[in-house]
Amino acid sequence: MRFFLDTADPDEARRVRDWGLLDGILLRPEAAEMKGRDARRVLLDLAQVGDGPVIATLAAGDPKAMYKEARELHKHGKNVVLRVPMTRDGLRVVRLLGDEQIATDVGLVFTATQALLAARAGSAYVSPSVGELDDTGQIGMDVVESIVRVYDNYGLETQICVQGIQNPIHVLDAAALGADVATLPFPVLDRLFEHPLTARGVAALRGPLSDGPRRIH
């Protein structure tokens, strides 16, 4: 499983890159705005952090407007992937961009049938949001499981990016189901390192060293 970092902070992306865990980035426009920065400037900065895909979200609108915005955003880097909404017009844009070898990710996906349509349209990625599904009383991972099964049945190459990840259990479940990517915020990724027994073992390893060299009798 690969990790895409859900962030608008280039410093977070660099930290994860230095850990050897940065496979891609998802930039949400609202996240950039919350930091008081222009989303396109942030996109340019993130695209230079690594070679992996950087997913930029298109504003929903008519196909011509989305297509025009997509081509403009793609100029920020060859690794920029354009996220389109799961709508009829969105899938038209997927097809148009695919003809120009511009990769897309279909978002706002909440059923396996929607994911099937995204794959048939030629999207490189599809992003079901488990957190939002869980918040409505559904089990988000059940949808991911269905998508994995459908894609396996037909040999579909669209990669499944599980997003809306809220905790390490979501990461484990997504990995166990065979999803290609976990798209997660920095705090959740950081928590994957932690376990009380690991902390105890690290403390024990530090103990003898902190006492200084011991004299051998």
Each PLM stretch: what is its role?
Residues 1-14, 19-96, 130:
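Active-site beta->alpha loop and helix N-cap motifs at the rims of alpha/beta catalytic domains
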Residues 11-19, 65-73, 93, 111-121, ...:
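Catalytic cores of alpha/beta
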Residues 17, 47, 74, 91-99, ...:
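Surface-exposed amphipathic alpha-helices with a cationic face
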Residues 19-24, 51, 76-80, 96-104, ...:
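Glycine-enriched alpha-helix->loop->beta-strand junction motifs that scaffold or abut catalytic
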Residues 28, 82, 118, 174, ...:
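Conserved, mostly hydrophobic/aromatic
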Residues 29-32, 108, 124-136, 178-198:
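Glycine-rich phosphate-binding active-site loops on the catalytic face of alpha/beta enzymes
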Residues 33-46, 62-68, 84-100, 111-119, ...:
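Active-site-adjacent beta->alpha loops and helix N-cap segments on the catalytic face
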Residues 151-217:
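C-terminal alpha-helical cap/extension of soluble enzyme domains
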